[in-house]
């Protein structure tokens, strides 16, 4: 335990950055507005001039912050519908949102200054184990073939409000900023202790996107920080409670002495003691922990996770949040794919001199398929088809122009194909394309009060071209016009598109 605390204090430094006075500066709120305009997911800031930034209202807000009763009204009237207890709903809405967005930028400043304050001759340590989300699937395809067990983890959230504040206390010593953070958290919760309702989380995430991401990333980085510590100590932790711990150490020393005598001896036999070969991947609120070894070792890691959440984050989690499966006999749902590592048989004919014989081998292959039932359920929920997958019209879109209807259906189809292009089987995607294409035709026919057959004959190839995806257009250049849909080999091609930016929307493209 002392080693655990020492490892924690070594990597956490208290920074003397007092950022609370910046809350009285107008340019902080201008930065918040610029982030909303330039961010990948814009944050709307309401104002009196067509949702544009109003410097006059910001100046009024700063003047009100200087007043003594500014925070007293909000604290003494917790049952008010809006923050800051102001008579005019419009001003209250603007002050609430612009203040929270400005504070979100405020709490990020100490972390930025810490990186800038590093000496030039001392390079900032690079975490080679951190990768972009674009490389997750190639990473799984490359590494998971050699692993045995997989733990599917649901990272628990939300946690105690005070724990979130304490996580930042290690790096921010600005007491007024921490008190202001407590104020925001308590305002968006129904009680003063927990954010227990999903409604409170949704409201907080919707109105304070940047602050929510900052707090969530701080919590997850803290969790992964101690997970890295457990990974470094994994050679000892699985054996700490064993009665034969000393005997195993003695056995390890014997093996090291044996290696000195026989340097050509392979060291791979002691991977259980030396290198458990653990790989960790996280996306949104889910994580995957895959490793070699026995089922007993995975059960140990499950206990470590539960104890870490319970004793450090004060979060009581249920064991069902962690599922342990054997890779060879199960599949896992991750980022919109059903992935597995099955053993496929391979028959090899070998001939030696006059004798020939067959060699039956089994090879592992990382297989990813599209969850057809789940995606058809999304289409059914969005009223593109019935629950069984029968295409229907979209009445709510009949007021749009023909071009807008075609564009919307085509964009949804291209997004599905673009994201799920790495699937090893494309039959499900072609079924989804058929549903969307026929649903589009029914919608246009309903708008013009015609039949589907008549409308498709009148529109011709323009209607079909709208549903071509990028990879299919490449194949179209290689075939004649009579074979536009006979892509006999395209279903075996696996293409991982690494230029996806708004990946969250593509995982669930209809919500």
Curated annotation (Swiss-Prot):
Keywords: Chloroplast, mRNA processing, Plastid, RNA-binding, tRNA processing. One of its GO terms (molecular function) is RNA binding. This is Maturase K. Usually encoded in the trnK tRNA gene intron. Probably assists in splicing its own and other chloroplast group II introns. It comes from Bromus inermis (Smooth brome grass). GO terms for cellular component: chloroplast. It is found in: Plastid, Chloroplast. Belongs to the intron maturase 2 family. MatK subfamily. The keyword Chloroplast applies. One of its GO terms (biological process) is tRNA processing.
